[in-house]
C-alpha cells in the first residue's frame, strides 16, 4: 500500500511539473526549437510509437517502452513487470479498440522537460472516432512519460490519463 501511495504521489508531482513547464515553455509552438532539440526528438519518438501501435506489429511497440510501465487511467493503476505482461496489455487494448469499432486521431501534441535531458512528458489530446461514421465519439488527454537511458535512449515508462480543461 505504501508503494502505491508513493507511485500516486510521484505521478501527481510529475504531472504538475509537466503541466507548468508545458504552459510556460515557448517550445510549444510547433516550429520552435528547444535548446538541444530533445523535446522535438521525444515528440517524434512518440509519433513513431503511436503509428506502430495503430498500424504495425505490437511486438515492435515494445522497443519504445521499458519492461515495467505504469498505466493510470480513471483512478486505476496497472504496473507491468516485464515485456510479456506489457505485450498482453497492449494486445487487450488493441482488441478493445476493434470491439468498439473506433480509430484514434491526434488533435494536439506538446511536450515539456521535467528534468533536462532526463525526463520529458508528451501531452497528447486525441479523439476517438467511429469507423462507420467518422464522427468524434469523445476527446481524451493523455500524458506519456519518457525517461532517457544512457545506452537505449528515450523509453516510455508511464502513461496517465488527464482531464481535459473543459472537464475541470
PLM feature segments, named:
Residues 2-9:
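Sec-dependent signal peptide recognition
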Residues 87-133:
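Surface-exposed, charged secondary-structure patches
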Residues 47-51, 63-78:
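Short, solvent-exposed secondary-structure junction/capping segments
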Residues 11-17:
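Hydrophobic h-region of N-terminal signal peptides that target proteins for export
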Residues 18-59, 63:
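Short, low-complexity N-terminal intrinsically disordered segments enriched in polar/charged residues
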Residues 58-62, 67, 83, 87:
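An amphipathic alpha-helix signature
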Residues 65, 75-77, 123-126, 160:
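A mature extracytoplasmic/lumenal domain signature
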Amino acid at each position: 500500500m505504501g508503494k502505491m501511495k508513493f507511485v500516486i504521489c510521484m505521478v501527481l508531482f510529475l504531472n504538475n511539473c509537466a503541466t507548468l513547464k508545458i504552459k510556460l515553455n515557448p517550445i510549444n509552438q510547433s516550429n520552435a526549437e528547444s535548446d538541444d532539440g530533445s523535446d522535438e526528438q521525444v515528440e517524434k519518438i512518440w509519433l513513431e510509437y503511436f503509428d506502430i501501435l495503430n498500424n504495425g506489429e505490437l511486438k515492435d511497440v515494445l522497443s519504445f517502452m521499458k519492461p515495467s510501465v505504469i498505466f493510470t487511467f480513471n483512478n486505476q493503476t496497472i504496473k507491468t513487470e516485464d515485456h510479456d505482461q506489457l505485450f498482453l496489455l497492449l494486445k487487450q487494448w488493441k482488441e478493445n479498440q476493434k470491439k468498439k469499432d473506433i480509430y484514434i486521431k491526434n488533435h494536439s501534441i506538446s511536450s515539456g522537460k521535467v528534468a533536462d535531458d532526463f525526463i520529458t512528458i508528451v501531452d497528447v489530446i486525441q479523439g476517438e472516432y467511429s469507423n462507420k461514421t467518422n464522427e468524434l465519439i469523445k476527446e481524451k488527454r493523455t500524458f506519456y512519460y519518457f525517461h532517457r537511458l544512457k545506452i537505449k535512449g528515450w523509453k516510455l515508462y508511464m502513461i496517465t490519463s488527464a482531464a481535459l480543461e473543459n472537464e475541470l
